[in-house]
Structures are given as structure tokens and as C-alpha cells.
From Swiss-Prot:
Proteolytically processed after NMDA receptor activation. Cleaved in a calcium-dependent and calpain-sensitive manner. Calpain cleavage is essential for the translocation process from dendrites to the nucleus. GO terms for cellular component: apical dendrite; cortical cytoskeleton; cytoplasm; dendrite; euchromatin; membrane; neuron projection; nuclear envelope. NSMF mRNAs expressed in the hippocampus exhibit a prominent dendritic localization which is mediated by a dendritic targeting element (DTE) residing in the 3'-untranslated region (3'UTR). Transport from dendrites to the nucleus is induced by NMDA receptor activation and results in a rapid stripping of synaptic contacts and a reduction of dendritic complexity. It comes from Homo sapiens. One of its GO terms (molecular function) is calcium-dependent protein binding. The modification Phosphoserine is found at S204, S290, S292. Belongs to the NSMF family. It is linked to Hypogonadotropic hypogonadism 9 with or without anosmia: A disorder characterized by absent or incomplete sexual maturation by the age of 18 years, in conjunction with low levels of circulating gonadotropins and testosterone and no other abnormalities of the hypothalamic-pituitary axis. In some cases, it is associated with non-reproductive phenotypes, such as anosmia, cleft palate, and sensorineural hearing loss. Anosmia or hyposmia is related to the absence or hypoplasia of the olfactory bulbs and tracts. Highly expressed in adult and fetal brain. Weakly expressed in heart, liver, spleen, testis, small intestine, skeletal muscle, peripheral white blood cells and kidney. The lineage of its organism: Eukaryota, Metazoa, Chordata, Craniata, Vertebrata. This is NMDA receptor synaptonuclear signaling and neuronal migration factor. One of its GO terms (biological process) is cellular response to gonadotropin stimulus.
Length: 530
């Protein structure tokens, strides 16, 4: 029940709005005719009176018309008779001249109104015909129930400027505009008579009852503008999102470049400054590391008695006696082996595979010195025992019973430490605590010469051990481990005079410089150079 009532109210409101639109359209067309043809001004008054009188009552009190889609406006002819007369005879539709049909279009600003609506009428079909100045058939002038006798003694309003002169009866029948015609007594807009707009086609439909199908034609320009606005808003939204993403990407890229350049700057400049400022602090902290702790001394568990003291002293004396005997025996055997003619004391090169381009080092040694023995060992998998066995085997191959006079250890490392094997770093603290490292250096000392009048030399290349005070401590601890053999350790800078002398002792200096220049290069294979 409520839905039906609301539906009827909606239909009534639509009907009233349609009636108001027709009245506004009638007045607009009348003003258009008055401006275009000043002599036909009475035609506009008749048109307004007809439109208003047809819809004077409310839509509820009027009977439903036969055709809701008829605008009931006539273009050819003038009104005859009073507005209150009812035609008694209705002729068939086929008789008499064909009326023109006017449609409502939404062109802007031809009729000012409070709702800013502008509605005008456009002639869409009909033929211009001349009719005699006699009374014609009566036509229905309004769908509201009142019928008028309309005659066509005049020519078309839009086609001739002489309608009112030829038909003076039309001027007598024209009533003045009433002030209750929905406020349509406003002054007409000035419009050039020669300027006429082409209007899009649209039919005005009165929707009052449900038995009439709805066939509304929306104006083409309004539909197009609506679609264009929607598409434009979507395009603007998409473009804004795309522009925002591009802006964020540019900002992120610029921030990444700035951060990368800043990190590079810190590596090139700031790191050196920080290193200079914190060198003393890092040196102090190095002594507090676990591997830098001094070796704890074992507690003396022996009884504090004279017997135990005498036993220890006698044991030490016996060990020293055996060591002296072994020392003398080994020294005599080495002297006998070195007495042969043409004997050259051997120089052993211990090369770690961790050194870049280490496989080319045996090819750049001095070719005029056959006493140089290169030994390349695997940094990842070799052990201290493997290295010692390889040194003994190469010495026996070179000359049986020969010992090392000079030795070069070419490996990676740094100030204060020596990187001999994987997970085996020689530092001044570790050579005192780790058993395998202590055993390696002691066995290596037994392979050094005992008949050399000068101390045996072990050169360190590939790193600068003495760049840190811990390097001197490391050398001192190694010398202590290798006693009673006289061994000295040297690690000069390669660009110094001592460094050049060390290089010339083992390498061809020209080939060594060439190898050094290609050591970290991937552009040229060293085999091609050699």
C-alpha cells in the first residue's frame, strides 16, 4: 500500500514537472517568434494562454489524456475563438493540414529561470504550407481536457513576417499574458534574429500511468559529456597514481645514490681518519682479547721436598746432555754433507695458495740460481705435518743431509699476525698456547742449518708483520721457540732497499714487477705475458 502511494506521488510530481516544462517551453518559443517576427507577437500570447489553460488544474483532478506524448503546440495558424470554448466536432486525423511538431531540448541560456534551466523549442518535422484565411478544423490545444477551436488563416509564424497583417482577427483574439502563468512574465532575452541554434532531438514524455511504455531519449550531448567526465576523472586518478609512483621511485633512487656515495666517501676518507683516531685504542683493546691473554702457568703439584727438587734438577740436566749430544751429532753429519764440491746452501720458498696468482710464482724465480726450492702448498686442506714432510723430501732431493740456510714464507697476513693455514693464524699469543703451532715451529727449527756461520734467515712476504708492535712480539716468541738454533726473522717493505734486496734474492726482479702488476687483474692472462 505504501509503495503504491509513493509510486503515485512520484508519478504526480513527474507529471507536474512535465507540465511546468511545457509551459516554460511554450513561452520560450513564443519569445523566439516575437523576437524573430515582431509582427507575430500575438502568436506568443496565444501560445502561452493555450499552454497555461490546458494545465490549469492539478494532474489529479484532470482525466487522463489519450496521448501523453503530444506537446499540443501548433506552428501554422492562429487561435480563433475564446479560450473557454469547447469544440463540438472533431475531424479525423487525416483531414486538414499537418501540424508541425516541436520538441524540448536542453540548450543553455535561452530562458532564464531560478533553476538555471534553459528550454526552447525546435521544429523537427513538418512542411511549410500556405493555407487560406478561413476557419479551419478545430484541434485539441492541450492534453488537460479543455479543447479550443483553432483556425489557420495565417501563414506559418516562423516562415513569414506578414501573418498579423493578413489576419487581423488573430490580434483581436489574443489575450494579454496573465501573471499567474507560473511566473513567465519576465522580460525576454535579447537574441539576434538571424542566430538560430541546431538542437539535438529529444521527446518530452509525460509519465502518469503505468500502461504507457517509457521511451525516453536522453540528449546526446549530455550523455557524451557525462561519459567524458567519468572517463576524465578515471584517467586523472590513474595518472595521479602513476605520477606518484614515479615520484617516489625518483626519490628512492636519488636517496640510494646519496647513501652509496656517502658510504664510498667514508671508505675513502672517513675510514682513514677514524683509523688514525682510534689506533691507540684498538692497540690497547688487542691485549684484552682472548687469544692475546698470556698463557696460564700450570700449578706446581709436586711436593715441596728436597727429593723432588733433586729429581727435577737431575732430569733437566739429563735432557740438556742428550740435546747437546744430538746437536753435535747433527752438526757433524751436516758438515760432512756440505763438504762436497759445488755445494750451494738451499733456499726454500714456502708459498701459500691463498696468495693471488700464486701458481705463477714458481715461474718468476731466479733462473740462474738452482738452490731455490719452491714449495706450493694448499692453504685450505694442508696441515703443518704435510708442509714439514714436503720440506724434508725436497731437501733430500736437492742434496741429502742438506739444511735450510735461507727461507721465504710467502703467505697472507697483516700487522702482528701470519695467516699460514685455514683457521690457523700465528700471533704472539697463539704460538705460546696452541700445541700444533708450537710443534710446527720447533720441527721447522731442526731443519735449519747448524753449520751456517751467520744466523739463518726467515723472510716473510705477502704482508707487513712489523706494522704493529705485536709483530715484533711474534718474532721474539718464534726466536725463543726455535732455540738453540740461531734464526732471525725479517719482513721489510717491498719498496724499501731491504725489500728490493730480499726480492732479488729469490725472484727475477723484472718478472716479479710484471707479476705484481697483473696480480689482481682479470683483463690479461699472465701466461700470455710470460
Amino acid at each position: 500500500m505504501g509503495a503504491a502511494a509513493s509510486r503515485r506521488r512520484a508519478l504526480r510530481s513527474e507529471a507536474m514537472s512535465s507540465v511546468a516544462a511545457k509551459v516554460r517551453a511554450a513561452r520560450a518559443f513564443g519569445e523566439y517568434l516575437s523576437q524573430s517576427h515582431p509582427e507575430n507577437r500575438n502568436g506568443a500570447d496565444h501560445l502561452l494562454a493555450d499552454a497555461y489553460s490546458g494545465h490549469d488544474g492539478s494532474p489529479e483532478m484532470q482525466p487522463a489524456p489519450q496521448n501523453k506524448r503530444r506537446l499540443s503546440l501548433v506552428s501554422n495558424g492562429c487561435y480563433e475563438g475564446s479560450l473557454s470554448e469547447e469544440p463540438s466536432i472533431r475531424k479525423p486525423a487525416g483531414e486538414g493540414p499537418q501540424p508541425r511538431v516541436y520538441t524540448i531540448s536542453g540548450e543553455p541560456a535561452l530562458l532564464p529561470s531560478p533553476e538555471a534551466e534553459a528550454i526552447e523549442l525546435a521544429v523537427v518535422k513538418g512542411r511549410r504550407q500556405r493555407h487560406p484565411h478561413h476557419h479551419s478544423q478545430p484541434l485539441r490545444a492541450s492534453p488537460g481536457g479543455s479543447r479550443e477551436d483553432v483556425s489557420r488563416p495565417c501563414q506559418s509564424w516562423a516562415g513569414s513576417r506578414q501573418g498579423s497583417k493578413e489576419c487581423p482577427g488573430c490580434a483581436q483574439l489574443a489575450p494579454g499574458p496573465t501573471p499567474r502563468a507560473f511566473g513567465l512574465d519576465q522580460p525576454p532575452l535579447p537574441e539576434t534574429s538571424g542566430r538560430r541554434k541546431k538542437l539535438e532531438r529529444m521527446y518530452s514524455v509525460d509519465r502518469v500511468s503505468d500502461d504507457i511504455p517509457i521511451r525516453t531519449w536522453f540528449p546526446k550531448e549530455n550523455l557524451f559529456s557525462f561519459q567524458t567526465a567519468t572517463t576524465t576523472m578515471q584517467a586523472i586518478s590513474v595518472f595521479r597514481g602513476y605520477a606518484e609512483r614515479k615520484r617516489r621511485k625518483r626519490e628512492n633512487d636519488s636517496a640510494s645514490v646519496i647513501q652509496r656515495n656517502f658510504r664510498k666517501h667514508l671508505r675513502m676518507v672517513g675510514s682513514r681518519r677514524v683509523k688514525a683516531q682510534t689506533f691507540a685504542e684498538r692497540r690497547e683493546r688487542s691485549f684484552s682479547r682472548s687469544w692475546s691473554d698470556p698463557t696460564p702457568m700450570k700449578a706446581d703439584t709436586s711436593h715441596d721436598s728436597r727429593d723432588s727438587s733433586d729429581l727435577q734438577s737431575s732430569h733437566c740436566t739429563l735432557d740438556e746432555a742428550f740435546e747437546d749430544l744430538d746437536w753435535d751429532t747433527e752438526k757433524g753429519l751436516e758438515a760432512v754433507a756440505c763438504d762436497t764440491e759445488g755445494f750451494v746452501p738451499p733456499k726454500v720458498m714456502l708459498i701459500s695458495s691463498k696468495v693471488p696468482k700464486a701458481e705463477y710464482i714458481p715461474t718468476i724465480i731466479r733462473r740462474d740460481d738452482p738452490s731455490i726450492i719452491p714449495i706450493l702448498y694448499d692453504h685450505e686442506h694442508a696441515t703443518f705435518e704435510d708442509i714439514l714432510e714436503e720440506i724434508e723430501r725436497k731437501l733430500n732431493v736437492y742434496h741429502k743431509g742438506a739444511k735450510i740456510w735461507k727461507m721465504l714464507i710467502f703467505c697472507q697476513g697483516g700487522p702482528g699476525h701470519l695467516y699460514l693455514l685455514k683457521n690457523k693464524v700465528a700471533t704472539f699469543a697463539k704460538v705460546e698456547k696452541e700445541e700444533d703451532m708450537i710443534h710446527f715451529w720447533k720441527r721447522l727449527s731442526r731443519l735449519m742449518s747448524k753449520v751456517n756461520p751467520e744466523p739463518n734467515v726467515i723472510h716473510i712476504m705477502g704482508c707487513y708483520i712489523l706494522g704493529n708492535p705485536n709483530g715484533e712480539k711474534l718474532f721474539q716468541n718464534l726466536r725463543t721457540l726455535m732455540t738453540p738454533y740461531r734464526v732471525t726473522f725479517e719482513s721489510p717493505l717491498e719498496l724499501s732497499a731491504q725489500g728490493k734486496q730480499m726480492i732479488e734474492t729469490y725472484f727475477d726482479f723484472r718478472l716479479y714487477r710484471l707479476w705484481k702488476s697483473r696480480q689482481h687483474s682479470k683483463l690479461l692472462d699472465f701466461d700470455d705475458v710470460l
